[in-house]
Amino acid sequence: SAPNQLEWVYPANPGSEDRATRFNRELIDETTIEDWTPQFTLTKGNTESTGSLLPCNDLHQPEKFSGFDVLSVLSFDISEGLTEGAGVGVLASGQTVYSSMDRFYIATTKWVDAEISEDEFAEWSESYSTDIHAFSIGVDTPAQYVASGIVAGTLLNQFSMDEHEGFLRIITTTGSPWDEQNLSESQLVVMKEKDNLLERVGLVSGLGKGESLYSARLLDDVGFAVTFRQIDPFYVLDLNDPFNPDIVGELKIPGFSTYLHPIDEKHVIGIGQNATDEGRVLGLKVSLFDVSDKTDPRETATWTMNDANSPAERDHRAFQVYGQTVILPVQSWSEKFNGAVLLEIGDGKISYVGEITHETESTEPVSDCRELTAVEFEGTQFEIWIEEYGGYIQLCKATDNGGYEDSWCESIPLSAIDNWYGD
C-alpha cells in the first residue's frame, strides 16, 4: 500500500525548490501516524469498519532503501476477520510473490531515484537489480519479517524463484539482448538467510548469452530454464550442491516455451510457440522433454497448431493436467477455433485426443448483406444507436465467412450508404 495521498508541492524550477521543501515539511508536521501506516476497510454485510492494519512496532525498514510503499503480510483466521497485530510490514515495494511451506518471499525491481541524471540512468539501466524480502509464516503464528537481499538483474515471474532446504534459488536476467556492448544473459543465484540479510552463497551464470529468459522451473535438486532469440536453448541445472550450482545439460530447438510443467521425475512439458530457425513465430507448440539424463535432455515429441496461442503461455492457471491427460485452452485465428484441446502424454509421445469448441449455434457465420434494425436489438444499447441513424446495414462479400448473427463485418448507416459506396 502507498501512503495516503498528501498534497505534495513539486517545484517547477530550481528557484522554487526551497519553497516547496518548506511547504512539504509543514505538511509532514501536520500529518498523523495514520497517514503513513497501512489502513484497512472491512465490509461485512451492511456494516463497514476501518482501522490501522499494523501498529508502528510491526513495521520494518530494510538496510537499503526499497521504496515508499509498505508491504504488508498478514496471517489471520478468515472466520474472525482482520485484526490489528496479525501481520508485519516492510517499507518496500512488491511485484512478484513466491511461497514455500514456512517462508513467504516478495521481489521487486530495484527502486530508482527520480533525480538520477541521464548518464547515471544509462549506467544504472545496464545493471538492473531485484530486491527480495523474506517473511516467516506459520499456521499458529503471525507472519514475521526475516531478511532482505539484492540480486543483479530482473525477475521473470514466480517460477524463477524456489526454496529448498533453507536455500532460496532465483534466476534473473542482466543486460539487454539488443545491446552489443552489454549483452543479456541469465544467472541462477542461491541465497541463504544470515541475521536479517539474504546473502549469496552460490552462483552459475552464462544462461542464454544475448537472449531473453522465457521460462524457468526449479524443483528440489534440478532446475530448467528456456531462453530465446532465434532458437530455444533448453537448459538443465544441477542444484544438488547449493554452493556450486551448475549447467549440466543443453538442448537447442526451434521455438520456445513460456511455461514448463513437470509430468513426472523424468519428463517436463513445455507450452509456448513454434518458430523457424530464423526466429519467426509460427504458432502454438507443446513440447515433451525427457530429462531422465540431466546431461542429455531430449525433446521426444511435439504438438503444434499454426497461427494459434494459448492463455497457458502467460497464465499457468489456464493449464490443467489429469494423470497423463493435458487440457489446454487454444485460440486459432486462421482456423477460427476457440476452445480447448485434449492431449495424452505417454511412452514419450504426445497424442491428440480431441477438442471442445466454445462456439454456439447462435454464432453461425453469414455471408450476405442484411439490414440491422432496432427490433433485432430491442432492449440493448444498440437499439437507440440504430434508431438514431435510421438503421444500419451489414456488408459482407459472398466469398467471406462473414460476420455472425449477433455481430457484423462492416456496419454502415443507411442514411450514409451513398457516401460510402455511391450507387
PLM region descriptions:
Residues S1-D423:
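Beta-sheet-rich non-transmembrane sensory/scaffold domains
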